[in-house]
Amino acid sequence: MKIIDGKKVSNEVLDEIKLAVQNRKKLNLKIPHLAAVLVGDDGPSQTYVNSKIRACERVGFESSLFQFDKSITENELISEIEKINVNDDIDGFIVQLPLPKGINQENILNKVLPKKDVDGFNPINYGKMALGIETFLPATPAGIIELIKRYSIDLKGKKCLVIGRSQIVGRPISILLSQNKIFGNATVTVAHSRSNNLKEICLDSDMIISAIGIPEFIKEDMIKPGSIIIDVGICRVKDDNSLKGYRIVGDVDFDSVYDKVSLITPVPGGVGPMTISMLLKNTLRASSLND
């Protein structure tokens, strides 16, 4: 089987979380509570938050949405976050990104209490991750790691290329895969918009993790036979044959590379579903740490 089925693995993780919640109920322990902070009325952000709320319902979590008008000031938003920090009923919360112009994202994420930072973006948690200390991992990299574990992918000594250096995916996954852990020990290269000879680097890589958001950028002639492809990108491209007028694709030209790879994540249905399930797994851990 060539497909790394993120939807299947995500469902397995959610079922495990649901069972853990049921066991907590039997022990009269607190039900995990995840909150989301949403600023403005950005359509995709609203969709992402709604999907997280539905996932909470599925596993038996409590959930809350704190939605604010895009006119909110940075200081006002910080004040609201500090209220959530001291709300003992909420185990973890996320600040949905991106934030509107005029609000400094770094300042906001710095204000999220580390023990409630289930997105793993607070500098304290980010630093722990870099040092290999157990903490909340950013959800998308955590999802990639979970797929690597469940598909028994051995990266020891393998050449792994990460394309993209964002704080959300590229940087953290490059750090994690280089660590001396069961899922790591890879020889990691990070490529980005200023990298030269990208095709040559790709052809020399045993695994490629692409997180650049350029539709179908990775072609068949850029990968070596038997490589593993983790496609984090998700884009809409025009498709007159679709009822919606578009189709969803990733960074990788799936059809052209399929016969050449050993394993590949599809888009949709690959990394995407894992992000929400790992966010909930972090929230379960946050709740357990409060017992």
Regions found by a protein language model. Name each.
Residues 76-88:
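Short, well-structured alpha-helical segments in soluble
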Residues 97, 212, 232-233:
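Glycine-rich, N-terminal phosphate-binding loop of Rossmann-like dinucleotide-binding domains
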Residues 95-160, 201:
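Anion-binding alpha/beta catalytic cores of soluble intermediary-metabolism enzymes, centered on
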Residues 1-28:
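Positively charged, low-complexity intrinsically disordered leader regions
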Residues 31-40:
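Short beta-strand segments enriched in small/hydrophobic residues
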Residues 105-122, 126, 230-290:
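Rossmann-fold NAD(P)-binding glycine/threonine-rich loop
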Residues 39-53, 135-228, 237, 244-255:
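Glycine-rich phosphate/diphosphate-binding loop of Rossmann-like nucleotide-binding domains
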Residues 56-70, 184-190:
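Short beta-strand elements in bilobed, periplasmic/extracellular small-molecule ligand-binding domains
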